[in-house]
């Protein structure tokens, strides 16, 4: 049984039954590469194998033929901080190579531009983009890098389809508010956001194809508190009309109270509101430098078209630098590897709180590091979405 570190309890039970009565089992695996807990994989099965089968003969394959000495040693320094693993010492017949490069960048765009320029130099020196990979913890984090590659027409291939943030209902809600502020008071648009946040407006009150706030006031004329809410909405739309997209999104989130609605929505759906806020951060970031709603809408259309073109190209031929999550790159190797956003909250992921979860995050980072044959870059940012970001604790372990 190969890749035994990824086995789950049900699979193990089946294998044990098949191995009876002679208990004849040959397994191969690397406990440091067990990264599929979300699929049910349990590295403890491999770690406890000798207890289940006393007298097991263990053979340690301790030579790494892929990485340079510098890359291998850096990865081993880091993974040794995991407590639940087989202690092992690996060596490589390869050259010492260049030290692992830890890069501090100010913002995600600067990080992406740094990678772009280095890739361009790599190609100018005779390297092939197919022998380079840019890795992220999650698919969504690849967005900035993909934008830069499309902007500078550098070919890339992506294993996963990058979601278009502008197709998300959160973005449609923001647009609904901004279009209403510009005078588009269609019933469909108004219904979408009239209770986001909750204003207690009923659908029965919205019966016209084009909504009139004056008609709404007449409908609720006997409820002064409802008229006050409609007056407030009208005032908010007037303010919104004068704002550029970045300020408008910020006002919808904090002034109108859209984030308040998202908190209630997340609690009702039993999901984390932080993930919705992160999407809003990404959407708001894209409005920087936009002077008008029309300009932003043109940008959104252009972005969507570029994503479709990229998907069409990829379906015909796969070439260029690989953009991938750490999970999807397991088993592959590249001459040059860049791991981006090596920050707390990304690597390790923000949901990893328990020691067991942190150990899996460390294994995942180890898998990413050991994809590199000759050159490895570990990049982190100091700021994102106008907030400070902390570099990953794993970088300290790599260095020391």
Predicted region positions:
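Conserved helicase NTPase motor core
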Residues: 1-47, 63-67, 331
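Conserved helicase core region in the C-terminal RecA-like lobe
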Residues: 3, 28, 138, 295-349, ...
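Short glycine-/polar-rich loops that comprise or flank the Walker A/P-loop
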Residues: 21-24, 30-32, 53-58, 96-100, ...
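Proline-centered turn/helix-capping motifs that create local helix->coil transitions or kinks
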Residues: 23, 78-88, 245, 290-295
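Conserved nucleotide-binding/hydrolysis micro-motifs of P-loop NTPases
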Residues: 31-35, 40-44, 64-69, 109, ...
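Helicase P-loop NTPase motor core
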Residues: 54-57, 62-155, 182-183
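ATPase/helicase motor core of nucleic-acid motors
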Residues: 95-98, 125-248, 267-271
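Accessory C-terminal helicase-associated subdomains
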Residues: 222-328, 349, 375
């Amino acid at each position: 049984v190969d890749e035994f570190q990824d086995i789950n309890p049900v699979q193990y039970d089946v294998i044990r039954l098949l191995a009876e009565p002679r208990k004849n089992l040959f397994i191969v695996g690397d406990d440091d590469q067990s990264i599929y807990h979300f699929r049910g994989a349990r590295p403890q099965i491999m770690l406890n194998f000798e207890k289940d089968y006393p007298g097991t003969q263990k053979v340690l394959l301790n030579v790494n033929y892929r990485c340079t000495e510098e890359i291998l040693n850096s990865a081993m320094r880091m993974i040794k901080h995991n407590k639940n693993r087989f202690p092992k010492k690996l060596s490589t017949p390869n050259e010492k190579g260049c030290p692992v490069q830890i890069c501090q960048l100010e913002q995600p765009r600067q990080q992406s531009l740094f990678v772009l320029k280095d890739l361009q130099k790599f190609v100018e020196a005779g390297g092939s983009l197919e022998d380079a990979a840019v890795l992220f913890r999650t698919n969504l984090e690849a967005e900035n890098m993909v934008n830069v590659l499309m902007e500078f027409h550098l070919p890339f291939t992506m294993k996963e389809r990058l979601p278009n943030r502008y197709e998300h209902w959160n973005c449609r809600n923001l647009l609904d508010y901004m279009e209403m502020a510009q005078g588009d008071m269609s019933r469909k648009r108004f219904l979408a956001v009239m209770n986001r946040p909750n204003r207690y407006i009923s659908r029965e009150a919205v019966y016209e194809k084009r909504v009139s706030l004056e008609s709404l006031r007449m409908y609720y004329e006997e409820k002064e508190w409802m008229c006050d809410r409609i007056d407030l909405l009208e005032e908010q739309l007037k303010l919104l009309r004068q704002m550029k997209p970045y300020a408008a999104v910020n006002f919808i989130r904090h002034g109108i109270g859209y984030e308040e609605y998202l908190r209630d929505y997340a609690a009702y759906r039993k999901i984390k509101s932080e993930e919705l806020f992160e999407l809003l951060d990404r959407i708001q970031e894209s409005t920087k430098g936009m002077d008008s709603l029309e300009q932003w809408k043109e940008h959104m259309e252009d972005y969507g078209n570029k994503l479709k073109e990229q998907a069409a190209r990829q379906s015909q031929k796969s070439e260029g630098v690989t953009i991938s999550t750490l999970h999807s790159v397991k088993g592959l190797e590249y001459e040059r590897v860049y791991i981006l956003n090596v920050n707390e909250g990304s690597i390790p992921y923000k949901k990893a709180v328990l020691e067991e979860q942190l150990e899996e995050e460390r294994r995942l980072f180890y898998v990413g590091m050991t994809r590199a044959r000759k050159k490895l870059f570990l990049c982190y940012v100091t700021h994102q979405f106008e907030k400070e970001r902390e570099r990953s604790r794993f970088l300290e372990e790599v260095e020391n």
